[in-house]
């Protein structure tokens, strides 16, 4: 098994066999990831084994209202919205869960966010976990909750 490093989703990647156990995450990868990438609305990165996707995450950009952010993030921003990178989706195939692939992809997303922040104004990485299980994973990884919404997490 030669698992790849995270790389940008390409036509060579095989998506049809991907199953993370969550139908909406499976469907988004299969039906929307390439379209979002070609339109520029999100960039998807995949981990694959012989081009068969076994994990993916998608990044996009957005903003959060100043009053919704922790003091550490809003300091010096006045009343302007806070620019963030959004970890829109992260999923690992059922057969590969529990091997650290999800943590590795999150680390890669954080690294990419840091690289982006060297070029443009970004204050944090924001996640929107899809369910309580994902939210619990985010809290275990030392991400910080968005004060106004319990299922949104910051990394800064």
Residue ranges and their predicted role:
Residues 106, 131-134, 150-156:
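Short glycine/proline-centered loop/turn elements that form peptide/ligand docking sites
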Residues 42-46, 56, 84, 89, ...:
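Short hydrophobic/aromatic beta-strand element in the GNAT-like acyltransferase core
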Residues 1-35, 39:
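Short amphipathic alpha-helix that is part of the acyltransferase structural core
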Residues 88, 93, 130:
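Residue-level recognition of the GNAT/N-acetyltransferase active site
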Residues 58-89, 97:
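Conserved acyl-donor/pantetheine-binding loop and adjacent beta-alpha core of acyl/acetyltransferases
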Residues 40-61, 68:
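Conserved beta-hairpin
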Residues 114, 120-122, 128-148:
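Conserved active-site alpha-helix within GNAT-family acetyltransferase domains
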Residues 98-112:
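Conserved acetyl-CoA-binding loop-helix of GNAT-fold acetyltransferases
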């Amino acid at each position: 098994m030669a698992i790849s490093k995270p790389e940008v989703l390409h036509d060579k990647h095989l998506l049809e066999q991907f199953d993370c156990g969550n139908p909406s995450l499976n469907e988004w990868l299969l039906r929307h990831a390439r379209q979002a990438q070609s339109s520029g609305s999100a960039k998807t990165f995949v981990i694959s084994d012989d081009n068969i996707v076994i994990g993916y995450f998608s990044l996009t950009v957005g903003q959060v209202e100043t009053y919704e952010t922790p003091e550490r993030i809003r300091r010096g921003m006045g009343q302007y919205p806070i620019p963030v990178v959004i970890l829109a989706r992260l999923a690992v195939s059922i057969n590969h869960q529990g091997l650290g692939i999800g943590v590795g992809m999150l680390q890669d997303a954080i690294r990419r966010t840091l690289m982006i922040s060297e070029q443009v104004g970004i204050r944090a990485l924001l996640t929107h976990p899809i369910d309580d299980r994902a939210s619990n994973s985010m809290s275990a990884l030392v991400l910080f909750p968005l004060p106004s919404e319990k299922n949104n997490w910051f990394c800064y």
